[in-house]
Amino acid sequence: MEAVVDTNNFVLLLWSGAQLPKDIEAVVGSLTKKVGPNGKVSLEHSDRLHIASHAMSSFDVVLSGVCESPSLIHSMELLSKLAKLLKPDGKLILREPVGSNDSRSPEKIISTLKLSGFVSISQANEVKPSIVEISAQKPSFEVGAKTALSLSFAPKPAQPKAETSAAQIWTLSAQDIDDEDVDLLDSDTLLDEDDLKKPDPLSLKAACGPGSGKKKACKNCTCGLAEQENGDATEKKSVTSSCGSCYLGDAFRCSTCPYLGMPAFKPGEKIALTDRQLKGDL
């Protein structure tokens, strides 16, 4: 176990369960001797790790469950916490009991380590029956580290021109135009006189009967159907009086009357209102 620890290393020893004090003291003593006076060995229980005041990226090596009779189950939450405590390129050595079923197998532990951000994961030889030892390493970068991308904003070189033979296929020379053997279409002959006639709006209406519907104007309508639809919409906006006294003048009009402010007019006389007058005041 001391082989993974170097001089001047900061080591975190994580334990859990009912460990014997002499077993913990033996491991701490051997590690303290290995790291030397400039190193440090910190002892922490797994249940109190979340309230400990350890700084992030402060340990070179984390030894978890390496004492006698390990019982610590390394969840993803615990492994993610250990990854934050390790320095970049820091090492993690863990031991965990495994059962005969697939609920806690070495493959499951390795998968959890990968999801927690560890790399260079390897399984050591069997320490004891039903106990597995796995080593892993934190990547060489910190969590949330930033790096500059080598982006070039220099002008890009011009694209190579198309082959001359390919360009000549789509071009005509002056000699080709004067050549009598070349048939050129006259654009004035593409449309007949019937094509230039404006259609009758009545012919655009759909036939009556079951399943027949009204034709709608196209987006770029040029046949006059759009103007006809707009005219129908304008006629639908005709305003009717609910009191029948609007034509007498403002003295007989409501506060929201669209004719308010206009002079009196004859009953049945057509009065044109603007869009602003058709909208009531809020």
Swiss-Prot record:
Organism: Nematostella vectensis
Superkingdom of source: Eukaryota
Protein name: Anamorsin homolog
Entry similarity comment: Belongs to the anamorsin family.
GO BP term (any one): iron-sulfur cluster assembly
GO cellular component, one term: mitochondrial intermembrane space
Binding site for [2Fe-2S] cluster: C208, C218, C221, C223
Cellular compartments annotated: Cytoplasm; Mitochondrion intermembrane space
Record remark on domains: The C-terminal domain binds 2 Fe-S clusters but is otherwise mostly in an intrinsically disordered conformation.
Extent of motif Cx2C motif 1: 243-246
Binding site for [4Fe-4S] cluster: C243, C246, C254, C257
Entries under InterPro entries matching the protein: Anamorsin, Anamorsin_N_metazoan, CIAPIN1, SAM-dependent_MTases_sf
Keyword field contains Ribosomal protein: no
Subunit annotation: Monomer.
